[in-house]
Amino acid sequence: QYFEWVDASREELFTEDPNDRRRLAGQVWYPAAASRSEARQPYLDFPERRLDMIAYQSGLPRFMITHMQRVQTNAVLNAPLLAQDQKTPVVLFSHGLSGMKNQNTIQAEMLASHGITVISVDHAYDAYLTIFADGSEADYRSSDTENRTGEAFLAFRSPQLNTRVADLVFVLNEIERRSDEND
């Protein structure tokens, strides 16, 4: 399952527009009822847009990664929840710099198959490419072109790390809020 939320309380660190608010796209893997008839999800959504960025970020020629667009996962979009007597534990996944929300799909699927819900967020502008439901994009803007070290590195990265932490706190709060509304 995919989600997209806006944290209206936070300005977007990575853009010049003071009216931009922090926008997040994410993906959830959860214990689901078995379904053989539903189409499995591809590993890459929007492969025609993602492959160029993956090639660029990894330093590989595009032809070496085009096979990724044919990879199918075990996930079924909006599959029915597996009936359980108790709430499932939740794991948050936060990709590394220039990563993506679904980079560890195989781990997320394995955890979900063992009764654990996994929530992953594309940290917009820290992910190599975030594609929102309306088709707009947040490209990677976290490069350190000056190769800073020590205090300069920390001064450069700290706002980004704080943004990532705030992203995860927002997602947890939003899940709790939505869960309370459904109880």
Each language-model region and where it sits:
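Divalent metal-coordination and catalytic microenvironments
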Residues: V28, L111, L168
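Alpha/beta-hydrolase active-site loop
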Residues: Y125-D183
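Residues at helix-coil transition
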Residues: Y30, S113, N173-R177
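Short substrate-entry loop that stabilizes the transition state in hydrolases
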Residues: V71-T88, L92-I131
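Domain-level recognition of soluble alpha/beta enzyme cores
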Residues: Q1-V91
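Generic detector of contiguous secondary-structure segments
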Residues: L13-E16, K101, T105-A108, T117, ...
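Short, surface-exposed linear patches
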Residues: A25-Q27, P47-D52, H114-T117, D122, ...
